[in-house]
Amino acid sequence: MFKIMKDFTEQEKIIVLDFGSQYNQLITRRIREFGVYSELHPHTITVEEMKALNPTGIIFSGGPNSVYDEDAFRADERIFDMGIPILGICYGMQLMTTHFGGKVERAKDREYGKADIHVENPSRLFAGLPTDQVVWMSHGDLVVEEPAGFEVTATSKSCPIAGIADEDRLLYGVQFHPEVRHSAYGNELLKNFALNICGCKGDWTMENFSEVEIAKIQEIVGDKKVLLALSGGVDSSVVGVLIHKAIGDQLTCIFVDHGLLRKGEADQVMATLQGEFNMNIIKVDAKKRFMDKLAGVSDPEQKRKIIGNEFIYVFDDEANKLDGVEFLAQGTLYTDIIESGTATAQTIKSHHNVGGLPEDMQFKLIEPLNTLFKDEVRALGTELGMPDAIVWRQPFPGPGLGIRVLGEITEEKLEIVRDSDYILREEIKNAGLEREIWQYFTALPNIRSVGVMGDGRTYDHTVVVRAVTSIDGMTADWARIPWDVLEKISVRIVNEVDHVNRVVYDITSKPPATVEWE
């Protein structure tokens, strides 16, 4: 491993152990909000591996199991003897309880939802917090007898032991979920743990992150060349600017314009990244190549496959024209690492077939963002001096407008989606809602309807407006856009976009629907 990686072991951090809770990522994100670096690791981590990480504190997450199940998730019990602060949340508290000789039993009724707790014995965990507060419960078991050396710190009507603490050994447990927004003072409780109990300074910022990453990239790459597939999206753009700041023209970006981008997107990407940041970008006009392959294709999965494969072929063709490239950069995020089942992020590894690239493309992979969440990537982009138009660009699927035109793709349909989407984004911005709505776009379903425009009957396309609010995209709710804003959007689309006589608003949440239509 490269010498520069010592920065990670010296950095104060809180490790979250994954016991299967749906809120695991939230715990990590909350800790990071206090300026403390945090990572999610599997519960199977050994004490030796944990010591190598050199954590300042550890959090045991919740989980769906009972501690008495035969296949219940366990932790290396030696972790309790490391002498550093540990916080057990829900299942984590029950695991801590049984380890130290307390008693856990099945609750008469599973408790799920808001509950009122009373803080009886204020430990350092509850310092400065109200005696009575609302929390979020989600458990089927409960602690009925605290272990020796522990005190009960909080109670509720249905849960007599809602919190425990052993101040001497810096061991704490809560039966509720402080990481969930429904817990009124959950953030303050986690902040007490991170800053007051663990003693973290809270100095992890995007400024020092970028400084460390630039130094890592310089040491790892040396005088070699790096190749980046630039999509124009937030992740690849931030990766490009970060690496360019580190190694300058040793970075070459390939930007494939497949003709499925949003209005003005290709020009904006080139003007910003090449014009303002002086990045070395090879723009490939592959619009005809993609449209020829997509002619007559209406099945969404087939469209995805064609677009994905053709992108690979175009990228491969251009990469083969370059000499001396040793590294491939990729905009992998921490979410991707977690969802792939490997919560151990490495800065560099051998590249064989990442993202479906040809197996004979033997690059080393460099992923500078693989410890960051999406909101942190945006913050990093701002820190790097990137304009809001790029940093706050709307999430955009890999196949682009190819899956926002339902059915067969034609140039006419693409223009309808481009123009209507541009109007939507303009009106959302005018209404000051662009930071409030997580994602918004237009789609063109493969239907036409009768209308009346002027004095004549029309039979034209229907445009769907889709806008959702979300935290991480795993679930989403339809955005409550004010009626007057929706009216402006509808009127403008019908009047300014050719071949459209109807606009509808999708008010379906995820689940049951997905955010995209295809």
Swiss-Prot record:
Residues 204-393 form the GMPS ATP-PPase domain. It catalyses: XMP + L-glutamine + ATP + H2O = GMP + L-glutamate + AMP + diphosphate + 2 H(+). GO terms for cellular component: cytosol. Homodimer. Keywords: ATP-binding, Glutamine amidotransferase, GMP biosynthesis, Ligase, Nucleotide-binding, Purine biosynthesis. This is GMP synthase [glutamine-hydrolyzing]. Pfam families: GATase (PF00117), GMP_synt_C (PF00958), NAD_synthase (PF02540). InterPro entries: Class_I_gatase-like, GATASE, GMP_synth_C, GMP_synth_GATase, GMP_synthase, GMPS_ATP_PPase_dom, NAD/GMP_synthase, Rossmann-like_a/b/a_fold. Catalyzes the synthesis of GMP from XMP. GO terms for molecular function: ATP binding; GMP synthase activity. The gene is guaA. ATP binds at S231, G232, G233, V234, D235, S236, S237. The active site is at C90 (nucleophile), H177, E179. It comes from Listeria innocua serovar 6a (strain ATCC BAA-680 / CLIP 11262). Its EC number is 6.3.5.2. PANTHER family: GMP SYNTHASE [GLUTAMINE-HYDROLYZING], GMP SYNTHASE-RELATED. Residues 13-203 form the Glutamine amidotransferase type-1 domain. Pathway: Purine metabolism; GMP biosynthesis; GMP from XMP (L-Gln route): step 1/1.
